[in-house]
Amino acid sequence: HAKVSTGTVYSYFKDKKEIYMGAYEAYLDSISTQLFERLDKVQPFCLEYFVNHWISAYLELYSGAGHALVQLRMMIMDDAEISQHFSGLENKYFLKIGEILGRNGNTQNNRSEKVYISCVLVDSLRQEKSAFTHNGLDFEALKQQVAKTVVRLLSE
């Protein structure tokens, strides 16, 4: 481990909140970059395959981030600046999914809203898999239902 003085850290960040924001942003950016590299390679484009690939890649990349994401959500609820900052990062994620869809012929009305709903559904699978598992739910059946719902939503 490299030793870094507190003074060095605070020369880049004004306080602990900025350190947390910078660390979370770097962490989420690295995961998102990997996700989009995978999704950009889906060719030839087929919506059903894209959605299944999106779900699998998202679960693989984000499932280990459950604890960090819970901590970040708690910070977002307590601090308007953090909330606004990470809302902007989420918007980039939604826009990138919409961009991939648009580039591949998906030009439906209300695409942004449909992408947002789809992202929430995909993330609910991550939560179920890694953080808030419910007894009595068949995860594979749930995953199939989410995939079918997202494909249908993005096809309308």
Language-model-derived ranges and their functions:
Residues 1-18, 22:
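Helix-turn-helix
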Residues 26-36, 49-56, 60-64, 80-105, ...:
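Amphipathic alpha-helical packing segments from all-alpha helical-bundle domains
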Residues 59-81, 127-132:
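Amphipathic alpha-helical segments used for helix-helix packing
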Residues 83, 102-149:
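Hydrophobic/aromatic-rich alpha-helical bundle segments in the mid-to-C-terminal region
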Residues 154-156:
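Generic C-terminal helix-cap and adjacent flexible tail
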